Amino acid sequence: LTCILKRYKNRRLKQKGMETLMEVLKDKDCTINTPVVLGVQDSPIYGKGISIKPRVDGRKDSKHFENIYLPELLPLEEYDLIVVLISGGKDSIACFYKLLELGVPKEKIELWHHDIDGGHPSRRMDWKCTQNYMKALADAEGVKLRVSYRVNGFFGELYRIGASEPVEWVDPDTGEIKQCKLSSNYLKCQEIKEQCLEEMEDLLKEYGCRMKFPAKSPDLSRRWCSAYLKVMVADSVVSNLDRLEELGGKRHKFPAKGGTHQGRWCSGNLKAAVQDSVTANLEETKKDKKILIVSGERRGESAGRSKYNEIEIHRTNAEKRNHRIVHQWRCCIDYTEKDVWEVLKRHHVNPHPCYRLGWNRCSCAACIFSTPGLMKGFSEIYPDEYKELRDDEERLGFTLDNKKNLDDFICGAKSCLCLDDKQAVHSIKTGEFTVDDIFVDDWKYPVGAFHGSDGGSC
């Protein structure tokens, strides 16, 4: 233990008049032989009036951090709802089981999963099996799963002109799709699109009226549905694109590999903004509620995350306006990777199939932070999707990587892909994953474990 602790990197967080010494074991230094320290089973505290304090006091080194500073959480039983933001990755799953070990009743917990693809009709950025993996976990544990998304997801946002698509979620009790309040810019863009159709109709009338069904003929002058209702509609929309762009902007480029959500819009617009919209619009969380948001960021993942607060006031907190208290708890922030795997091992949870094929992080399948080896693996397991991304680069004139196109990016790289786990290969390729697959008696570390944290969100 002493030898391993010597490899810890000391980090100091400057706070008002004091420095807090932190010992952080980076994921790249964590191995299968690293001792389990924080990942041991927790003792129940729910219902005992115990407030949770952070292991390291929160930052107060700027106005922003002063505003969100929180010295301690409420006792867990005082929250009306505890939301676990869950991606399917090991860290967020460990958060869920930590809550159970602390004694939180399952009926008090909801798993919130943000579907990065948003029901896009043809394109996918995430793993094919992630949605079924999440459903299998929720069903196996008997907890509610609330899936939320921005309509048309990553590729809808990538090719966006005008305002972003609305945020929707699926009610876990009824299966009904609910929609958050539409933005004023989105409504204005819709008006422009409807105006296009009206202008097209007026234009058609100048050349005569049909008032009869199209003929079943290869002659487009008689099969007028194709000629007048597709080609001309497209032309009308194109003529109004400048106005749409003026109202809502446009993307037409991949997210930046930066630390801010503005440039890295996949995290900002498809995850954080989605979660905030659902919290503010959901009847169960809208007002007169105390909510705890639990997420799985860890200090060992990156230099940026090493500076995160364990607890803080969440950005959707609205005590004055809606009497809504929202706190955030990164309950595994000080865990090592070994600690996290220990939690999954203790509960016999089958890791997401991507870990079992060699991926060290459960991000999107084609995550913008992928290393050359990870992207090489993606090109091998999903060759069609890889080709589509290359076509996107050509079409947009903008590469996924900051400096080179995908072919150059992966050239000469050693693929991460390991095909030994046939069940995982099947799940990744087909998307199939059932309740019967979620627990395993003979638990083993996946091949992607202990390969550092490069290749995922930082």
Feature annotation, model-predicted:
Residues 3-8, 12-458:
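Nucleotide-activated chemistry modules centered on ATP-dependent adenylation/adenylyltransferase
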